[in-house]
Amino acid sequence: MTVPAKVCEASLPGGAVKGLMPERGEEFQEKNAYNFATGGHSSDAVRNWGLGQCLLAGGGVSLKVEYRFLQGGDYTRADVERDARESGSTPLTLGDAGGYLEGPGAHLFVDCPVRPGGDELLEVSVGVGGNGVDVKDRAVRSSAAGLAADAARHVARDIRSCPDAEKLPSGPPRIG
């Protein structure tokens, strides 16, 4: 199966996606992608996007990459840390961003305050499902975490313009 070099409106590298797709099977498809590509939009309009989604499928496997902007203190860093310690979760760290693996999915949270001292978070999630997906497979979990990191860097830097987004390191998050 051929996975494009760029996915999600050509905004994310396809490498981690390739690691999640089977070698053979039905053709790769990108469906229902919105609010990932920034071309043709003003920076003010893009910064107001509160959520985005990209559905990818092929060979009986489906991926959902999504982000949302969390504000109002309903879900905080303390909640992220608590959920990362829950049974069945594995902590993730990408620089100052934190999150967790849960089943075959990855969740990363980037501090993205709109004012000094604000507690707003950017949540980026990757869900993996479909035929033959082993939720405990290290390669699946690692690729899902890598895709979440790619999406977190893109959304934090290019869409939400989060303070300190440039400090998010390249590469996959640390697992464990």
What is the role of each PLM region?
Residues 1-159, 164-176:
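A small/polar (G/S/T-enriched), proline-flanked helix-loop surface module common
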